[in-house]
From Swiss-Prot:
One of its GO terms (cellular component) is plasma membrane. This is Protein transport protein sec1. Keywords: Protein transport, Transport. InterPro entries: Sec-1-like_dom1, Sec-1-like_dom3a, Sec1-like, Sec1-like_dom2, Sec1-like_sf. PANTHER family: VESICLE PROTEIN SORTING-ASSOCIATED (PTHR11679). The lineage of its organism: Eukaryota, Amoebozoa, Evosea, Eumycetozoa, Dictyostelia. It comes from Dictyostelium discoideum. The keyword Ion transport does not apply. It comes from the Eukaryota. Belongs to the STXBP/unc-18/SEC1 family. GO terms for molecular function: syntaxin binding. Disruption phenotype: Defects in locomotion.
Length: 598
C-alpha cells in the first residue's frame, strides 16, 4: 500500500500546528483562524471533526466578521499574502481591545520581506507567541494525488497573450518544493522537452530545492532518492477530451459536482422528497473502492454486495430484487435500522444508476472516440468508415454541442491535422460558431497540428511498454491508455530516454533499490473488494523504496490519476500524480477558448 499523502498532510497539520498549541489559561482550548486558501489546504486532508477534537472551539475565516474572544489564544493558519497579513494586523490595531489573547502564526510558505516588515511594525507583533512557516502549499486531494489549486495555468503558461508567465512558473516551483519537503524528499528532477514550460519549471524547482538543502538544517531527506518528472499538457492534449467510463471520471464529467459535492433528491420512508448533499472523497470507503472501476462493474458490485449485506445481517425478509439499481434503492430505504451503512449504499446506488442511464446515448460515440484515440478498432485492425461515422454524429441534431466539439477535436488531433476545407465543412456540419472555433485554432498552442501537412513539433511520445490494448481489456470503450501511464512505466523500468526526458542535473549513477520491481499480474487476487466491509481489518504492507512523483502542468485528468494508482498497485511502489489543477472536459474546452481570441 502506498504511503497516503492525505494522511501525511493531516498528521503535519495536527502534529506540527494544532497539537503544539496548548494554552494553560484556557485549559488547552484555542481558536483557529484561516483564509480561503489555507482552509482549502486543511479541508483537502482533514475533517472539521479532526480539528475540533483537538480543543479548537471555533474555526473562522479571517475575512469574515468575527466575535472578539480576548481571553482565548488563536492559531492563525494563513497564506502569506498582503491581504491576509493586513487582516491579521487589523485584528490587533487597538491595543486595548485585541481580538484574541495571543497569536500563534503558522504560514503555508515563506513570508515575503515586505510583509515581514509590515507585521514587525504593527501592534500585532507584541501578541505573537509562535511563528512558523510550515511549507504546505498544495491540496492533498487523494492518497496519491495532489494539485496546486492554480486553475488558470493553461492561459498563463501557454497563451501568447500571457503577460508574465515567469511569475506563475516560480509559484508552481515553490509549491512543488513544499510537496517535496512534506514527503521528506530531495528528488532527482527530470522534465519533458515537449514544451519549454516544463524545462523552466523544472529549473526553478531545482533552484528552490537546492536553497532549502542549503538553508534549512532540519531538513533531512530520505537517502533513497525519489524522482520528480515534470510534464505538461502538450504531452497528451487528447486525454481531457475522451469519455472515460470509470466511476469517478464519468460522474465528474456528466454531473454538476462542485467541490466534490454531489447533490440529489432522495425519497424518505414516508414518501417525502429531500435534497441531500454528499461529499465524494476518501473518507467514504465505498467511493475509494469503486472510483476506478468501470461503471458496469460498479453497478454489478453494488447490487451483489447489497445482497450479501442483507443475507449477512439476516434481513432477507425484505425480499430479493432482480439486480437493478432502482430496486436496490427501494430495498435500502426499507431498512431504517441500518441507516449508516444503508446511507452509503443509497448514495452510490443513486449515483451509479444515474451514470449508467447515460451510457446508452454515449456508447456509439465512445466506440468512435476509442478508434480515433488508439488508431485501431476493438480487434486491433485499422478502424473502418471513420469519416462517415464522424459525419453522422456531427450532423445529429440531438447530440450535445460539447460532445461534437470534443469529438471533432479528437479527430483533428488523431489525424495529425486535416485539410482546411474539410475542417470548415465539419465545423459547419456540427453547427460550431465562429467564436467556438477559437478553441480549435488554439489547440496549436498545445502543440497540435491543425492542417494536414503543416510543419510543427510533434509531442514527444515514450516507448510503448505494452502491446495493443485491443482485445485485451474487459470493455471496448476503455482501450485508450493515457500517455502519462506509458511515461511513468518507462521510468519505473528505467527505459525512459534521457534525450527526450532529460535530467536537470547530471544523470545519476544507477543505484540499487531495496524495492524490487514486481512482475505480478495486474489482475487482483482477492475476489471480495476491500470496500465491502469497513470493519474488516486488512493487513497491508507499506511500499518501500524510492518514490515517483509525476507532475502535469496545465491540468490532469481522472483517467491519468487512475492510471497512476494502477501502476502503483502493480509495481508495489509509491507513485504520486499531481498537477496545477483537475481538468474536466468542459473546463478544458472553455480554457482553450480563452488562450487567444482571433
Amino acid at each position: 500500500m502506498a504511503t497516503s499523502l492525505r494522511e501525511l498532510c493531516k498528521d503535519r497539520i495536527l502534529n506540527e500546528m494544532v497539537r503544539t498549541i496548548t494554552p494553560e489559561a484556557s485549559n488547552g482550548w484555542k481558536a483557529l483562524i484561516v483564509d480561503q486558501d489555507s482552509l482549502r489546504v486543511i479541508s483537502a486532508c482533514c475533517g472539521m471533526f479532526d480539528i475540533m477534537e483537538e480543543k479548537v472551539t471555533v474555526v473562522e475565516k479571517i475575512d469574515n466578521p468575527r466575535q472578539r474572544l480576548p481571553n482565548l489564544e488563536a492559531i492563525y493558519f494563513l497564506t502569506p499574502t498582503a491581504q491576509s497579513i493586513d487582516l491579521l494586523i487589523n485584528d490587533f490595531k487597538k491595543k486595548s481591545s485585541p481580538h484574541y489573547l495571543a497569536i500563534h502564526l503558522f504560514l503555508t510558505s515563506k513570508l515575503p520581506e515586505v510583509e515581514f516588515k509590515k507585521l514587525s511594525a504593527s501592534l500585532a507583533v507584541h501578541r505573537i507567541k509562535t511563528f512558523k512557516e510550515i511549507n504546505l502549499e498544495f491540496l492533498a486531494i487523494e492518497s496519491q494525488a495532489f494539485h496546486l489549486d492554480q486553475n488558470n495555468t493553461l492561459f498563463q503558461l501557454f497563451s501568447p497573450d500571457s503577460i508574465d508567465p515567469t511569475e506563475e512558473q516560480a509559484k508552481i516551483a515553490t509549491r512543488l518544493v513544499s510537496l517535496c519537503v512534506s514527503l521528506n524528499e530531495c528528488p532527482i528532477i527530470r522534465f519533458s522537452r515537449s514544451h519549454p514550460v516544463s524545462a523552466m519549471i523544472a529549473g526553478f524547482t531545482q533552484e528552490k530545492l537546492d536553497n532549502v538543502m542549503r538553508t534549512v538544517k532540519s531538513f533531512k531527506p530520505n537517502d533513497d532518492r525519489s524522482t520528480l518528472l515534470i510534464l505538461d499538457r502538450t504531452q497528451d492534449p487528447l486525454a481531457p477530451l475522451i469519455h472515460e467510463f470509470s466511476y469517478q471520471a464519468m460522474v465528474y464529467d456528466l454531473f454538476d459536482i462542485e467541490n466534490d459535492k454531489f447533490s440529489f433528491d432522495t425519497v424518505t420512508n414516508a414518501g417525502a422528497t429531500l435534497k441531500k448533499d454528499v461529499l465524494l472523497g476518501e473518507t467514504d470507503y465505498m467511493w475509494s473502492g469503486l472510483r476506478h472501476q468501470h461503471i458496469a462493474d460498479v453497478s454489478t458490485n453494488l447490487t451483489t454486495r447489497l445482497d450479501e449485506f442483507l443475507k449477512t445481517n439476516q434481513v432477507s425478509q425484505y425480499g430479493q430484487h432482480t439486480g437493478s439499481l432502482k430496486e436496490a434503492g427501494e430495498v435500502v430505504r426499507s431498512l431504517p435500522q441500518y441507516q449508516e451503512m444503508m446511507g452509503k449504499y443509497s448514495v452510490h446506488i443513486n449515483l451509479a444508476d444515474r451514470a449508467s442511464a447515460k451510457f446508452p446515448e454515449l456508447e456509439q460515440l465512445a466506440y468512435l472516440e476509442q478508434d480515433l484515440a488508439t488508431g485501431e478498432d476493438a480487434n486491433g485492425n485499422s478502424p473502418k468508415n471513420v469519416t462517415g461515422r464522424l459525419s453522422n454524429y456531427l450532423s445529429d441534431f440531438s447530440a450535445e454541442k460539447y460532445n461534437k466539439i470534443r469529438l471533432l477535436m479528437m479527430y483533428i488531433i488523431s489525424q495529425d491535422g486535416i485539410k482546411e476545407e474539410d475542417r470548415r465543412r465539419l465545423m459547419e456540419m456540427a453547427g460550431i460558431s465562429q467564436s467556438e472555433q477559437n478553441a480549435f485554432t488554439n489547440l496549436r498552442y498545445l502543440g497540435v497540428t491543425l492542417m494536414k501537412g503543416a510543419k510543427g513539433k510533434k509531442p514527444i511520445s515514450p516507448p510503448k511498454n505494452r502491446k495493443s490494448e485491443s482485445g485485451n481489456v474487459p470493455y471496448e470503450v476503455s482501450r485508450y491508455v493515457p500517455v502519462v501511464k506509458d511515461i511513468a512505466e518507462n521510468i519505473i523500468n528505467e527505459t525512459l530516454p534521457s534525450t527526450d526526458f532529460p535530467f536537470v542535473k547530471e544523470e545519476p549513477i544507477a543505484r540499487a533499490t531495496n524495492a524490487p520491481v514486481s512482475k505480478v499480474s495486474l489482475k487482483g487476487k482477492s475476489k471480495q473488494p476491500r470496500w465491502a466491509d469497513p470493519n474488516v481489518q486488512v493487513e497491508e504492507t507499506k511500499y518501500s523504496g524510492s518514490k515517483l512523483i509525476i507532475f502535469v502542468i496545465g491540468g490532469m485528468t481522472f483517467s491519468e490519476m487512475r492510471s497512476i494508482y494502477e501502476l502503483s498497485s502493480h509495481y508495489k511502489k509509491n507513485i504520486y500524480i499531481g498537477s496545477t489543477n483537475i481538468l474536466l472536459p468542459k473546463k478544458y474546452i472553455d480554457q482553450l477558448l480563452t488562450l487567444k481570441n482571433e
